[in-house]
Amino acid sequence: MKVINLFASSIITTLSMLTLPIVLTSTSIYKNKLYPQYVKTTISYAFMISMIPTTMFIYSGQEMIISNWHWMTIQTMKLTLSFKLDHFSMIFVPVALFVTWSIMEFSMWYMHSDPFINRFFKYLLMFLITMMILVTANNLFQLFIGWEGVGIMSFLLIGWWHGRTDANTAALQAVLYNRIGDVGFIMAMAWFLINLNTWELQQIFISHHNNLNMPLMGLLLAATGKSAQFGLHPWLPSAMEGPTPVSALLHSSTMVVAGVFLLIRFHPLMEHNTMMQTTTLCLGAITTLFTAICALTQNDIKKIIAFSTSSQLGLMIVTIGINQPHLAFLHICTHAFFKAMLFMCSGSIIHNLNDEQDIRKMGGLYKVLPFTTTSLIVGSLALTGMPFLTGFYSKDLIIETANTSYTNAWALLLTLVATSMTAAYSTRIMFFTLLGQPRFNPMITINENSPLLINSIKRLLLGSIFAGYLISYNITPTSTPQMTMPYYLKLTALTVTLLGFILALELNLTSQSLKLKYPSNLFKFSSLLGYFPTIIHRYMPMVNLSASQKLASTLLDAIWLESALPKSISYFHMKSSVTISNQKGLIKLYFLSFIITLILALMMINSHE
């Protein structure tokens, strides 16, 4: 009993500690220059305390639900504040706290000259808190609060530099695309309420309903919006308009993995529904390939890393599609470390080169930024799934499982091509930023010796090397069964990755001396992001607006307000007057009509007398 009390109290302490700096915003501490330090220290302590229940959970394997506040009862449905402390939430919480701790420390260096740095830290912390609410929620209502929370905080953080039009547009774009996904979430919530009369996860999972396609489609739409899957993906690269720490937090342990996490949570409903699994698998495969193609020709360092995030999210969705939610979750956890580190390395480069983001204007940075360079190389190799780095433990397993799943060879092929392309664009980043001759302004002073920068990246560097090994041993199944697959299947992931490296290196060396008169159609397709923004953001609104203008001017003004009423009345009057007053020269007829009128008048007078 004491163990259970310690478990529950330590996790509640972790979550309550995070709210302390938010509460302090009404005091003088919020105006203090040391406020960012308070926030960072709070998160570091929260991480250390969260390791207690996580360690206990790993050793005991005992799931727990804390239900400690009954909010309201609507007819037969009870709404309570309840936390689900299972395998997924207990491992995710320390990972998210560890990554955010490093990002907060990095932000103290990156945003030191910002006049509103205290507000920035408060927003980052609220972003983390809403993600924690989402992860630990045991009912759909609480999950929805966390879901909307990360949405609104992403809007505030992406549009942080609201003096720039691009930042405002990107923030609005993120909200609008997520709004489409939220429609699916609300639809699923409404369906569960009408048909199952509950929002509690346990009751939803044990209830047997014949057809769950409708709510699962809604949840898939929600995940598509939040995790930037194909169709609702353009907001993710645009979100790079926010400061680099925002990009790091947005793409590692919060927001974008929320959609994948939602599908993992509702996996018990999906595991026997083959239609939904096939849909999820195909959606993930298309996303991972399409975004990998887009990443190949981008020149903005942050955009390339953003597209790589979208590609990895597609891989996670593929994993859910082949019925492996635990592997998808493992990839979420491992991906958080190296992706946050890649963004922080790019932030270090951007900051040192006076806000230069174009990789064509970098080069030779391995001499002047040795630590950042080392971290960037390790992060890129971990992303490609290089053996025994963090990414390998999840990515290799995913490719192996897909190879032996005997379903949908088309989706598997797309995933393998995308894996190869991951190596290609990672090589491109390393080739253009770190190698060759310096192509930046020689007058720039470069300095990476700040302890805030070094320590934050160092922690994630260690995570990118060792975290995969540690997490993969504490994820189910804990004992791996004997694998019976031929060597060529076992080595597929490594082979396609090495192929991507070799091809990319060859192409990078060739492209330096290659001069094309006109860019090829494939290049245009990739650099213009598959014509998606052009069609969705330019062509379709233009067609709509021009059609509306024509309808308003032609139908309303020209026809109804002009032709139908004023012109038609005047035309009718003119026609009738012309018809009536037309002189034909029939004098006898005129006299006759005059006499008839006169006789009628006289008769009326006589009869009156």
Swiss-Prot record:
Protein name as annotated: NADH-ubiquinone oxidoreductase chain 5
Its source organism is: Phoca vitulina (Harbor seal)
Task: Report one GO cellular component.
Answer: mitochondrial inner membrane
Task: Tell me which family the UniProt entry assigns to this protein.
Answer: Belongs to the complex I subunit 5 family.
Which GO terms are recorded in the biological process aspect for this UniProt protein?
Answer: ATP synthesis coupled electron transport; electron transport coupled proton transport
* Job description of the protein: Core subunit of the mitochondrial membrane respiratory chain NADH dehydrogenase (Complex I) that is believed to belong to the minimal assembly required for catalysis. Complex I functions in the transfer of electrons from NADH to the respiratory chain. The immediate electron acceptor for the enzyme is believed to be ubiquinone.
What's the name of its gene? Answer: MT-ND5
Q: Which reaction does it catalyse?
A: a ubiquinone + NADH + 5 H(+)(in) = a ubiquinol + NAD(+) + 4 H(+)(out)
Its keywords, alphabetically, are: Electron transport, Membrane, Mitochondrion, Mitochondrion inner membrane, NAD, Respiratory chain, Translocase, Transmembrane, Transmembrane helix, Transport, Ubiquinone
Q: How does it sit in the membrane?
A: Multi-pass membrane protein
Q: Could you say which EC number(s) this protein's record lists? A: 7.1.1.2
Q: Which residues cross the membrane?
A: 3-23, 46-66, 90-110, 115-135, 140-160, 174-194, 216-236, 244-264, 276-296, 304-323, 328-350, 368-388, 410-432, 460-480, 485-505, 585-605
